[in-house]
């Protein structure tokens, strides 16, 4: 027993020694995030970095954005505001920027009835120097769930994917907590004028409330998401948009995670030229782990699964992934140790070599912490998350030099 405790203590010290110090991370100033701020979302076009977030005051929701200029947040701007929004820790507004046509896309979820599981995806479009409130991203009128949106620049507009509940019976879910029909994965394209076109069904049965993630690799849109089988296997699948159609979804890796309910823990994808990386969380056989795979051919095939070794800490997921060079990525995830949470990141190259585990911060494991964001901008890695462990819940943002990873 004593020997086991000594080993555990040694490994914990080893982890701590490999974690970076607070000096590696510098807080980002400029725009002050209000006490009620939460749900940050980062997007970088390479030349520009923007953030979106929400605030709530007196039953009114506000969706804001700001730019990263000269090492600080600047030009805070209101995208839209309103009441009866659906905003939660896992399904929150996003933002994207197409530098080819100088347009931006954002969204929020608007309640469509008094039913708990009834809301639409309302999107907002920025062009010619101002934001326009548009209509729904989807083309149905059902009073059901629509959410978990991801978007990415495509040609001179955007590609967007989301979870769509039009084929579910949510009156039944209101009564007994279970929907009678499957959740769909659907997509659409948005033109440089802000118009929606080409709605597609990507997968007719997917996990109900895990994030989708989309990228474009050499002009090919690629979406990853948590799939769902009839026997409740919920592994990660991928589909590519080729010649006007989405390919038949295939599994990224056969984790064979059987779980009778959504784990609310979606995958993440990023691309750099023909290289693609996908990271995800799984707890098959009761063993929680964060893994990733690389592709060298625009997501057509993937190499071996790479485990993000964590030795002591218990990974809980909420992953994000970002290319920082031609063949290197950074992965972030949440872990817990003896009930206390931390946000970690690690550099991995395409050959599977891993750098040190970097501890970003102690972080609450509550749902209100949300899904931390990382984004490369110039020579730095930008980090954003909701600090819900203090008396005042608000967004924190940091930067660290990529050379220190």
Whereabouts are the PLM-identified features?
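Bacterial N-terminal signal peptides that target proteins for export
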Residues: 1-9
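Hydrophobic h-region of N-terminal signal peptides that target proteins for export
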Residues: 12-20
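Extracellular, repeat-based ectodomains that mediate carbohydrate processing or recognition
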Residues: 20-405
